[in-house]
């Protein structure tokens, strides 16, 4: 044998004799158990046996080994549990066991060895059991390449037995030959050795202290050891040539114990292949193939020089040790992945000199405070710094410039509790912020927007600090202490101070990227005129998108957004067509100007000039006001002073436009006549200093602009006035400029040159300021409450402006400016939403999370779709004559308020499940002290389920092209209503589309889809959304908004997922030279002859759709005649060929590269509505299963939603499309598939009750086809194999293979979806239920089910009506009876989430008849094709349904009743499946003939 050549040392002494002692007994129930202690050398263990076990052992030994029959003490029946008998028997049994051990001193018989647990604890028994196991399964294990797990005790037993030098088969049983083990270990590749921490089993054996030798393994590629003492493990070094992966856990105190066990024998050693620098005692071979080493969870305190022996290592895991310093890793040139988490590292100085090529570095759970040592790890891709002590944000700068870094984790550091922690950290990465995944959370669009703002803020601060450094001395000489003008350097950060635990809303500054073309072309913002440090700001967003030529940023960004027609150059001079009636009156902020900030020196110089001119014009009024305030302060009381200030304020505020030049000259001449010029100048200077806190000359020459805010402004002074504005915050006050409405659609140069000064006021005239809506609307009250400015802009800029304004006031003055009516900067939009929903008593309002809020105008008005004879809907929309303002007044205000109300913006606030429409009250704010819950009552809320909100598919044929339409107008379909949303801020439309599409895609279960009535009117082609979201159709219409004080209930069974209306295939196949279809106009920036953007189907493989798929879907698209249909389903059923594929991709598909695989018509039942069976068109794709449902389900669930939005109207009735409900079950959510008896139906089960649906195909062929296609699709969803070699991942590749095999009627698919088929137990349950309902089950022979089919019972219609309704039934045919049952298809078998059994039984017997009582069978085509009428003789003596009286078969309204006079009972049954129908007739005729001796009469009727 192979063992003959093995030698582990001299032969050991003879083994000590084994002993077995009975040390006690226990009474268990009614019998006694004897406790036996077995000793084998130093090892001992305890076992328990009752007397009957001894008796069985003795019988087998007598039979096999012929021992003395009287050796075992006799059995006693009476008094067997008496104490005296038990004690005597203990002694006798101990003598018996000792005798057996002496009889068999070397090798115990097999039965005795198992009785004494030798196979678990004794050396020979352990090796014999292992050898027998490998004899039977060894080849199978080696062939499968699976991991073989072995215990240290087994390895110890093998080592000990080899060292004893005994024969390899001492027992004489060839199966237990030690050679089987050695043959197996020589070829094994994947080994796992797992010990235990404490004693093993009932023994005193501590496995972690047992020595063993691994040199018997000759071909190891991968080994894992845990809870073994590395000092006692020998022979592992013999696997150096082949071992590629090694894991040693809970076993080592140093790396040398594992990598250089020879180090304990040699003082000086060097790795093989290195140049020897001095005397050494040994040259040790390296680990030639080792690339992965896991030494985690040990007690390693240093990375010693043993790493020199693993030069090819790529993956090194030293986590959960005690490493203090990163050292010696410079020898690992191939190291790519290093895990040093949860050690004791406190410094990383010089770590880049030791980790040159590392891509993944895990430093979590250490004591790190500084990251400066990481700044040169240029190859780093993944960095984990969780659970450290990093406090300063500046530390992130050390890794901010690493060019390859993609994933960073900083959670559970002191740094992570900073407000806006994510955006501030991301801003440290500069232009690469979009590529960084922070804390395992992908960077969102809103975070990138905030990062851009923070970068711009930082750049502005840098520029500001440079400018202030040159003028600091001048400013200090002339600034008075009473009016701090310049924001102190110690002011807090101005980013949005929201809580880190609350999701921030979408920050609306993305529009900066849309003005880069104009900004670069403008003479005011040309990069040539900017300082070198400022040039990156003007192109920040452009650079972040790549080095694109000028003019392409806006167009390409717009093309990537669903709902956007295309990018339009701001300089494009094409005439605008009014998108909605009265749209010329709409006030909006153009996006061509928001790129001009306080860092643009030319722009700032122009603003300074305008402000200086305005101050000179307003100087007399300010001087007069200052003088009067001084006099009032000294002579009059507080009330008179307020009255005079009010009079003065009326004369000095809101001066519009530049004054006449002649007036200025005349005024100047009059002043010279009244006073001496020098005295007047002195008086003006002193008064201005008193009023503004600044020297006049310095003010006029050095106006310091702190912040420029482009915004939408609502000014309330008795009446409401709205205009697009530019607010300029200076160190003395605030200046307001208006963008003339007629100029808002021009180029940026035109807009900037036409800026009109409105008014300005010093800081001292500001009485209150705060947020009407946190992060959305800032309010400034100027001197008197009726003069109020409502500032609407994006959150980041508003907070920046608010923070800069606060810094202009001393802390003691801020308390006077805070308002109890307004919110402070510390309140988040999420908190405001929670308070608002609580005020309106919305259920679950505290759980709602704001995903974005957008100011819009909402318009609704009637429009009529006029269809031509050719069926072309494009361009045939007639708008009712109305103006925008009147439309908004009618829709948004009560009739009594319509005359007083102006067209003011609303806010669309998106949450995960709802679209919230918020209307704010912009009436004059009350004075201080009159706060009485005004901030709650001043908002009106209307909520619409997001599942009912769609982008209007008719948008392409109703909305003209143009910059205004592209950037501000979006048409929605809310329920059955058409609503036009006009966004007042730039780029907000595109943010809304991004968030809307993400939320729609995340909705579960039910969603609303649009199905075009005519292929020519299908939703237009749109580009894919960035981030892989599905394309959506656009919106067009004017709709009146109605408000409801409470939330509208969401449709059950669940909310809807996104309606993915991808482009139609007909457009995809258009030739390159063909003009773009009317529904998909080419982008404005493209040449006139250019083709429209490639539709979504261009993403899928070229062979899709194949001709076979087109043909099969056409053949399968045949709706059964018995299923009720609605117009939308009728339309689908009429489609043929490629039109079906087009419908799927234009209206149903979720993602761009999704492919349709199968189509099925069936009725379905949902878990939440078990009593409702509804028709559905089932579409199986590569991503999900879609159920397009009958409109009856919508009516069933929409009763509580019959509000303004959900009432059908002429707009919808005349529209070129249908609105349908679609249930979506994503394949990733699918957990199990239950197949019904005889394949008559199947149930798809997800993770929740809303994701359980049963398809009642009532046809085994249809069920089989669907399941076959489903398995094929699921197979394509299997996880892709690891790119590493197979040998690297033996845990997953060679683990437990339990998929793809049928066990207990369950098939675990390779995708982990469980397919459950009917078991014999299920058939037995059905048989039992039927048998129990029979009159005398005992007298009847055993039932044998011949046929089980899902059918319908035709109910006899009332007179004057058409064909009777169908009632679902289960028809069961046995050898002698036929039954009709009511079956629960949806609740059984119980889903895993079910906590209690259903209220209904699975089967309820409705009727039963004997086959011999069947008189004849009638087959006709009226009212249903080939419906069967089974005519029975109603005999009195039949033994079925004995408990049911004849009244059961009497005439009842809508019931089956009797067919006529006489003693006959008729069952009118409709079987949809022709195959099942023929099988029923065939089996019924055969059984009837066997029972009655003649052929069954089958008659054909009309």
From Swiss-Prot:
Modified residues (Phosphoserine): 542, 544, 547, 1282
Residue spans of biased composition, Polar residues class: 540-549
Alphabetized SMART domains for the sequence: LRR_SD22, LRR_TYP, PX
Chain intervals for the UniProt region annotation (Necessary for binding to phosphoinositide-3-P): 1-134
GO cellular component, one term: recycling endosome
Stretch list, region Necessary for homooligomerization and targeting to endosomes: 121-693
LRR repeats: 289-310, 312-333, 334-355, 357-378, 379-400, 404-425
Keyword annotations from UniProtKB, A to Z: Apoptosis, Cell membrane, Coiled coil, Cytoplasm, Endosome, Leucine-rich repeat, Membrane, Phosphoprotein, Receptor, Repeat
Region annotation (Interaction with ITGA5) ranges: 707-805
Cell compartment(s), UniProt: Cell membrane; Cytoplasm; Early endosome; Recycling endosome
Annotated Acidic residues bias: 637-648, 660-683
Domain named PX: residues: 12-122
Segments for region (Interaction with LIMK): 659-867
GO BP of this protein: actin cytoskeleton organization; apoptotic process; glucose metabolic process; negative regulation of cell migration; norepinephrine secretion; Rac protein signal transduction; regulation of blood pressure; regulation of synaptic transmission, GABAergic
GO molecular function: identical protein binding; integrin binding; phosphatidylinositol binding
Subunit structure: Homooligomer. Interacts with GRB2. Interacts with PIK3R1; probably associates with the PI3-kinase complex. Interacts with IRS4. Found in a complex with ITGA5 and PAK1. Found in a complex with LIMK1 and PAK1. Interacts with ITGA5 (via cytoplasmic domain); this interaction is direct. Interacts with PAK1 (via kinase domain); this interaction is direct and is increased upon activation of PAK1. Interacts with LIMK1 (via PDZ and kinase domain); this interaction is direct. Interacts with LIMK2; this interaction depends on LIMK2 activity. Interacts with RAC1 (activated state).
Note on domains (UniProt): Both the presence of the PX domain and the coiled coil region are necessary for its endosomal targeting.
Function per UniProt: Acts either as the functional imidazoline-1 receptor (I1R) candidate or as a membrane-associated mediator of the I1R signaling. Binds numerous imidazoline ligands that induces initiation of cell-signaling cascades triggering to cell survival, growth and migration. Its activation by the agonist rilmenidine induces an increase in phosphorylation of mitogen-activated protein kinases MAPK1 and MAPK3 in rostral ventrolateral medulla (RVLM) neurons that exhibited rilmenidine-evoked hypotension.
Protein's name in the database: Nischarin
The organism of origin for this protein: Rattus norvegicus
Lineage of producing organism: Eukaryota, Metazoa, Chordata, Craniata, Vertebrata
């Amino acid at each position: 044998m192979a063992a003959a050549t093995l030698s582990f040392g001299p032969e050991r002494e003879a083994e000590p004799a084994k002993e077995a002692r009975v040390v006690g007994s226990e009474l268990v129930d009614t019998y006694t158990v004897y406790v036996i202690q077995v000793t084998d050398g130093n090892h001992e263990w305890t076992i328990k046996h009752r007397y009957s076990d001894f008796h069985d052992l003795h019988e087998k030994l007598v039979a096999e080994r012929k021992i003395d029959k009287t050796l075992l003490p006799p059995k006693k029946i009476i008094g067997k549990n008496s104490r005296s008998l038990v004690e005597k028997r203990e002694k006798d049994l101990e003598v018996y066991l000792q005798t057996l051990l002496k009889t068999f001193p070397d090798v115990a018989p097999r039965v005795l060895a198992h009785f004494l647990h030798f196979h678990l604890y004794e050396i020979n028994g352990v090796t014999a059991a292992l050898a027998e196991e490998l004899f039977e399964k060894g080849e199978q294990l080696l062939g499968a390449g699976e991991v073989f797990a072995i215990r240290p005790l087994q390895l110890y037993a093998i080592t000990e037995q080899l060292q004893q030098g005994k024969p390899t088969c001492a027992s004489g049983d060839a199966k237990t030959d030690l050679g089987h083990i050695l043959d197996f270990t020589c070829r094994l590749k994947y080994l796992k050795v797992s010990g235990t921490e404490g004693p093993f089993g009932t023994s005193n054996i501590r496995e972690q202290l047992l020595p063993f030798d691994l040199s018997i393994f000759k071909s190891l590629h991968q080994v894992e050891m845990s809870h073994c003492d590395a000092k006692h493990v020998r022979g592992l070094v013999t696997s150096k040539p082949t071992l590629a992966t090694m894991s040693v856990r809970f076993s080592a105190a140093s790396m040398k114990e594992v990598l250089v066990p020879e180090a304990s024998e040699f003082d000086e050693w060097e790795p093989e292949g290195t140049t020897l620098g001095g005397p050494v005692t040994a040259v040790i071979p390296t680990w030639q193939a080792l690339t992965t080493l896991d030494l985690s969870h040990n007690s390693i305190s240093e990375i010693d020089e043993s790493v020199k022996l693993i030069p090819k290592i790529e993956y090194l895991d030293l986590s959960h040790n005690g490493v203090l310093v990163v050292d010696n890793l410079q020898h690992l040139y191939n190291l790519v992945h290093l895990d040093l988490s949860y050690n004791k590292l406190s410094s990383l100085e010089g770590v880049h000199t030791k980790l040159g090529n590392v891509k993944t570095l895990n430093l979590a759970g250490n004591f790190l405070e500084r990251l400066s040592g990481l700044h040169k790890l240029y190859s780093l891709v993944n960095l984990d710094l969780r659970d450290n002590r990093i406090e300063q944000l500046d530390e992130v700068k050390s890794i901010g410039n690493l060019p390859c870094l993609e994933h960073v984790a900083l959670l559970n550091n002191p740094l992570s509790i900073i407000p806006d922690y994510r955006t501030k950290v991301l801003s440290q990465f500069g232009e690469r912020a979009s590529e960084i995944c922070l804390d395992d959370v992908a960077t969102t669009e809103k975070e990138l927007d905030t990062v851009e703002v923070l970068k711009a803020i930082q750049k502005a601060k840098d520029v500001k600090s440079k400018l202030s450094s040159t003028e600091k001395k001048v400013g200090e000489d002339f600034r008075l202490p009473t009016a701090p003008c310049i924001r102190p350097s110690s002011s807090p950060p101005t980013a949005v101070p929201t809580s880190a635990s609350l999701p921030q809303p979408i920050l609306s500054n993305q529009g900066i990227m849309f003005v880069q073309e104009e900004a670069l072309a403008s003479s005011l913002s040309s990069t040539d005129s900017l300082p070198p440090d400022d040039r990156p700001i003007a192109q920040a967003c452009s650079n972040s998108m790549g080095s694109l030529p000028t003019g392409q940023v806006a167009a390409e960004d717009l093309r990537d957004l669903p709902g956007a027609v295309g990018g339009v150059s701001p300089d494009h001079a094409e005439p605008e067509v009014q998108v909605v009636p009265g749209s010329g009156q709409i006030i909006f902020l153009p996006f061509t100007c928001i790129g001009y900030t306080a860092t643009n020196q030319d722009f700032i110089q122009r603003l300074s000039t305008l402000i200086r001119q305005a101050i000179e014009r307003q100087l007399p009024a300010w001087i007069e006001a200052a003088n009067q305030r001084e006099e009032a302060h000294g002579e009059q009381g507080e009330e008179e002073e307020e009255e005079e200030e009010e009079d003065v304020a009326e004369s000095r505020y809101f001066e519009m436009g530049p004054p006449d030049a002649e007036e200025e000259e005349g005024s100047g001449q009059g002043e010279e006549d009244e006073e001496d010029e020098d005295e007047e100048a002195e008086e003006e200077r002193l008064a201005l200093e008193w009023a503004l806190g600044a020297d006049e000359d310095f003010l006029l020459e050095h106006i310091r602009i702190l912040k420029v805010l482009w915004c939408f402004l609502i000014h309330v002074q008795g009446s409401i006035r709205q205009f697009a504005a530019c607010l300029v915050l200076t160190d003395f006050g605030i200046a307001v400029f208006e963008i003339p409405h007629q100029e808002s659609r021009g180029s940026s140069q035109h807009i900037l040159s036409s800026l009109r000064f409105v008014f300005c006021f010093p800081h001292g005239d500001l009485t209150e300021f705060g947020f009407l809506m946190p992060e959305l609307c800032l309010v400034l009250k100027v001197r008197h409450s009726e003069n109020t400015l409502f500032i609407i802009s994006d959150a980041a800029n508003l907070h920046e402006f608010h923070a800069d304004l606060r810094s202009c006031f001393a802390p003691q003055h801020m308390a006077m400016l805070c308002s109890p009516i307004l919110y402070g900067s510390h309140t988040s939009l999420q908190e405001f939403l929670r308070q608002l929903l609580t005020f309106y008593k919305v259920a679950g309002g505290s759980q709602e999370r704001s995903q974005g809020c957008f100011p819009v105008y909402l318009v609704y008005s009637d429009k009529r779709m006029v269809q031509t004879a050719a069926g072309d809907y494009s361009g045939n929309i007639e708008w009712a004559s109305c103006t925008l303002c009147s439309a908004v007044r009618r829709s948004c205000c009560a009739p009594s308020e319509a005359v007083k109300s102006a067209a003011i913006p609303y806010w669309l606030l998106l949450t995960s499940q709802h679209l919230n429409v918020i209307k704010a009250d912009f009436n004059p704010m009350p004075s201080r002290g009159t706060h009485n819950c005004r901030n709650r009552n001043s908002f009106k809320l209307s909520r619409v389920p997001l599942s009912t909100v769609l982008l209007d598919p008719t948008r392409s044929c109703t909305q003209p092209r143009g910059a205004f339409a592209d950037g501000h107008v979006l048409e929605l379909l809310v329920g059955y209503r058409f609503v036009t949303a006009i966004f007042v801020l730039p780029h907000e439309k595109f943010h809304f589309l991004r968030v809307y599409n993400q939320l729609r895609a995340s909705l579960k279960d039910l969603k609303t889809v649009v199905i075009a009535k005519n292929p020519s009117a299908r939703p237009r082609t749109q580009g894919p959304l960035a981030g892989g979201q599905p394309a959506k159709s656009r919106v067009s219409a004017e709709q009146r908004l109605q408000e409801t004080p409470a939330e509208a209930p969401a449709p059950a069974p669940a909310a809807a997922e996104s309606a993915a209306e991808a482009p139609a295939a007909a457009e995809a196949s258009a030739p390159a030279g063909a003009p773009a279809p009317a529904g998909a106009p080419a982008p404005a920036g493209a040449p006139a002859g250019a083709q429209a953007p490639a539709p979504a189907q261009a993403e899928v493989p070229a062979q899709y759709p194949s001709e076979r798929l087109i043909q099969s879907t056409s053949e399968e698209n045949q709706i059964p005649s018995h299923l009720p249909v609605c117009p939308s389903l009728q339309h689908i059923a009429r489609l043929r060929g490629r039109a079906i594929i087009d419908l799927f991709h234009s209206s149903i598909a979720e993602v761009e590269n999704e492919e349709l695989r199968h189509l099925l018509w069936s009725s379905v039942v949902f878990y939440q509505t078990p009593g409702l069976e509804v028709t559905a068109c089932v579409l199986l794709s590569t991503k999900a299963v879609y159920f397009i449902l009958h409109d009856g389900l919508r009516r069933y669930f929409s009763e509580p939603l019959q509000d303004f939005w959900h009432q059908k109207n002429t707009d919808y009735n005349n529209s070129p499309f249908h609105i349908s409900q679609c249930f979506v079950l994503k394949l990733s959510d699918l957990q199990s598939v239950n197949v019904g008896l005889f394949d008559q139906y199947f149930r798809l089960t997800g993770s929740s009750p809303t994701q359980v649906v049963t398809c009642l195909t009532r046809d085994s062929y249809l069920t089989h086809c669907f399941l076959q296609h489903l398995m094929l699709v699921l197979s394509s969803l299997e996880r892709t194999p690891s790119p590493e070699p197979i040998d690297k991942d033996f845990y997953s590749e060679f683990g437990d293979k339990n998929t793809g095999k049928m066990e207990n009627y369950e098939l675990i698919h390779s995708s982990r979806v469980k397919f459950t088929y009917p078991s014999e137990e299920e058939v037995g349950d059905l048989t039992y239920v039927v048998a129990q309902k029979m009159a005398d089950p005992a007298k009847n022979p055993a039932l044998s089910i011949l046929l089980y089919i899902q059918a319908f019972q035709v109910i006899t219609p009332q007179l004057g009506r058409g064909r009777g309704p169908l009632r679902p039934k289960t028809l069961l045919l046995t050898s002698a009876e036929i039954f009709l049952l009511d079956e629960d298809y949806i609740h059984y078998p119980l889903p895993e989430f079910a906590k209690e059994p259903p209220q209904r039984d699975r089967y309820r017997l409705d009727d039963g008849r004997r086959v011999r009582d069947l008189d004849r069978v009638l087959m006709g085509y009226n009212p249903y094709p080939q419906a069967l009428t089974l005519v029975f003789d109603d005999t009195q003596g039949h033994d079925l349904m004995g408990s049911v009286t004849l009244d059961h078969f009497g005439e009842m309204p809508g019931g089956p009743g009797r067919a006529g006079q006489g003693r006959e009972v008729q069952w009118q049954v409709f079987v949809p499946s022709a195959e099942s129908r023929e099988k029923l007739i065939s089996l019924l005729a055969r059984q009837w003939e066997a029972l009655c001796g003649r052929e069954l009469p089958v008659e054909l009727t009309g």
